Amino acid sequence: MQNSEENKRRGGSRGFSFFARNEDGMRRVEKEEIQRVIVQREAKSYKGDFGRLLLIGGTYPYGGAIIMAALAAVHSGAGLVTVATNPDNLTALHSHLPEAMGFDLADHQLLCEQIQKAGVILVGPGLKEARENHAILNMIFEQVSSQQVLILDGGAISLFAASQFDLPEAQLVFTPHQKEWEKLSGLDLASQTEGKSRRAVQNFPQGTVIVEKGPHTRIWTSGQDEGYQLDVGGPYQATGGMGDTLAGMIAGFAGQFPQVGLYERVAVATYLHSAIAEDLSKEAYVVLPTTISKEIPKWMKKWSDNLNENVENETFS
């Protein structure tokens, strides 16, 4: 991968000290730690306190991807969500999610304005690998700052891996599935072991968060040797849009919960995504991503109110 030496100077997120180890030596999320992230909202707060998000993607024929990401972001509590997408998707977006704003991705002037306003930018769900999108990714890289969170998912990962771009001075999150991780790390599927992935993560700018999606999803950050591995989730999640929904949840959490670091927010969002799916699988052969999104507010309410005793222990331990 390509990055500048300047990127290496950026400080990483603080240690995720409130995780317990599993049998493989990786760490796992404990109930108490989820409650440290998902806290009750202050009485005197407004939508601007909970993240201004810009989601970019949904080029033809992948309009559903960006809509599912937006659904997850809004249901995760994001304060303001704006979607830059193919104009053919806007009617469907507003039909499914009137809470979100949307505009034509081809309107580069408006896109630039929205990039400057956003605190969290998610690019990639349903983003086709095309020349015009290569230019859009370059535009984003040139404009984002160290104060912004930039999440690269799906098509944005492939576009970046095929480019010669230097990574920007933003707070970076990558959410690759196994083939996308191969493009980023150079590790084929058989080589994506715990140890080799750990070493590959260190090639990214310090503080970069990597969600290495797979049968046993791992979460890493550059600058720390230890990673975290999910012990929830399963094959009932193997359906289109699951990763888009996860990316939207991560974006939603990234815009909130300043009492903990970005790494913590990403890890808990990733965990909650699979924990909800596991619970739903008790009554469903396949769990749809949009069904997960509908459940997010209920689960966040339980955690923030310390009511998780109503949820079966095995779902979260």
Locate the predicted segments by residue.
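Small-residue (G/A/S/T)-rich helix-start motifs and N-terminal tracts that mark the onset
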Residues: 2-149, 158-170, 178, 182-317
